[in-house]
Amino acid sequence: MAENQYYGTGRRKSSAARVFIKPGSGKIVINQRSLEQYFGRETARMVVRQPLELVDMVEKLDLYITVKGGGISGQAGAIRHGITRALMEYDETLRSELRKAGFVTRDARQVERKKVGLRKARRRPQFSKR
């Protein structure tokens, strides 16, 4: 492992991302694929780039990411959280800027479990008066 490599773990919903950052040209590799190949949706790509754009490091750092679990939106959120943590390890002065944007806080919202006697978590079966 390189000495000038920084690491951050990000989580969102049921996804977990491991993010490695090192100085480079702005290459983003997710599970051995490019950002454009991995995420078909432009919104997911935007979410991933947000912390880098905020601190103007898009072309200064290379990112190597492995992500598991969940769907597209959860994985994008987990990667964003991981990048934020790795950036804070890289330069602690970025913390306040990232905190202000709301990237440092882990989004703790999870899927609510289905209850017995209900159709979904809160959706009740149709009620018939007669």
UniProtKB/Swiss-Prot annotation:
Pfam families to which the protein is assigned, alphabetical: Ribosomal_S9
GO molecular function, one term: RNA binding
Keywords: Ribonucleoprotein, Ribosomal protein
InterPro entries to which the protein is assigned, alphabetical: Ribosomal_Su5_D2-typ_SF, Ribosomal_uS9, Ribosomal_uS9_bac/plastid, Ribosomal_uS9_CS, Ribsml_uS5_D2-typ_fold_subgr
UniProt record, GO biological process: translation
Keyword Ribosomal protein appears in the UniProt entry: yes
Span of the signal peptide: none
A GO-annotated cellular component: cytosolic small ribosomal subunit
Superkingdom per UniProt: Bacteria
Similarity-based family: Belongs to the universal ribosomal protein uS9 family.
PANTHER family for the chain: RIBOSOMAL PROTEIN S9, SMALL RIBOSOMAL SUBUNIT PROTEIN US9M
Protein's UniProt name: Small ribosomal subunit protein uS9
Gene field: rpsI
